[in-house]
A protein has these predicted regions:
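Nucleic acid-binding interface residues in structured DNA/RNA-binding domains
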Residues: 2-156
């Protein structure tokens, strides 16, 4: 039985990515026509690492950055989200090993400034980290969002 891959190993495994593909008919209903870039996990992590304290980024900005970088119409919404999640857990793995300079995953939001409850420690961990950096978190129905998050978005 082979050992389970660590989050860090998952992040490093590019599986032949990035690659740019034509948007399929099934996908075009929601995303339009053109091309989609499926990024390498490391690329998503690199963008997340660029966000300084007090600043934020959303998955949508990451996708736009990837699309521009690869001259694609869009960045893949599914894999970009999955790779951000892997990056978050790899960061916590690094922290557990005593590394200080980890990927600040708590600064990467879902669209609309929403906190990602799937990140390590859930909403509570994110609230503590984000409030410590000067952000105000409000509840909108079942979601938690950062008030005026647009004002804190990083320009890449």
């Amino acid at each position: 039985l082979k050992a389970k891959k660590s989050w860090r190993e998952k992040l490093a495994d590019s599986k032949g990515l990035p690659k740019v593909e034509k948007i399929t008919d099934k996908m075009s209903k929601r995303w339009g026509t053109g091309t989609v870039v499926i990024p390498a996990p490391k690329e998503v992590d690199e963008i997340m690492k660029k966000v300084p304290a007090g600043k934020l980024i959303t998955i949508n900005e990451i996708r736009q950055t990837l699309a521009k970088r690869h001259r694609a119409t869009i960045g893949c919404p599914i894999t970009t989200g999955i790779f951000a999640w892997i990056s978050a857990y790899a960061a916590e793995e690094d922290a557990a090993e005593g590394k200080r300079n980890i990927t600040p995953y708590w600064r990467t939001l879902k669209s609309g400034g929403e906190l990602n409850e799937k990140y390590p420690g859930g909403i509570e961990n994110l609230k503590i980290r984000l409030e410590a950096e000067g952000h105000t978190i409000i509840r909108k129905g079942k979601k938690y969002v950062i008030l005026d998050y647009e004002k804190a978005l990083i320009k890449l």
